[in-house]
């Protein structure tokens, strides 16, 4: 998320975007069936500002009944990339390098088309996220790979 903040001209909000990225799945491991629902009271109790809570919860749009539609560019990026990072991460593990450093868009496209590969990663959500951003899938794939490379160093 920090990569995207810089790339999209939100350099003054890099830490905010990064924190949203770190916290977005705060409730998933303990309450997968209530993902993006349990996050709200957890984050409120921790004193997290409402703007950040909204951003975190919005990545569950369409998947959980309480998640608002992403409206800020950051929320759209998180929505689009959440499922995609799972697919790219799984694809990286299949490579000899086990890394995204040598990952290419064409490799992601091939895995994206194979519905059995990383089947839990919703291709529909990825497509919807790209549409929200006004991006072609190739651009989303490329930028997400580049973002993941910065986290892997």
Mark where each language-model region is.
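Divalent metal-dependent catalytic cores for phosphoryl transfer on phosphate-bearing substrates
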Residues: 10-115
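A structured, mid-to-C-terminal "fold-capping" secondary-structure block
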Residues: 100-103, 107-153
């Amino acid at each position: 998320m920090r990569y995207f903040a810089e790339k999209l001209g939100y350099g003054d909000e890099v830490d905010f975007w990064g924190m949203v990225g770190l916290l977005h799945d705060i409730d998933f491991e303990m309450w997968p069936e209530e993902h993006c629902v349990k996050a709200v009271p957890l984050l409120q109790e921790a004193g997290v500002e409402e703007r950040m809570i909204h951003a975190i919860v919005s990545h569950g749009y369409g998947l959980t009944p309480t998640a608002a539609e992403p409206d800020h560019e950051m929320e759209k990026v998180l929505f689009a990339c959440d499922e995609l990072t799972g697919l790219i991460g799984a694809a990286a593990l299949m490579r000899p390098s086990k890394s995204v450093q040598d990952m290419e868009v064409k490799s992601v496209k091939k895995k994206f088309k194979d519905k059995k590969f990383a089947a839990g990663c919703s291709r529909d959500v990825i497509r919807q996220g790209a549409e929200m951003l006004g991006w072609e899938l190739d651009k989303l794939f490329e930028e997400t790979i580049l973002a993941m490379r910065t986290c892997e160093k």
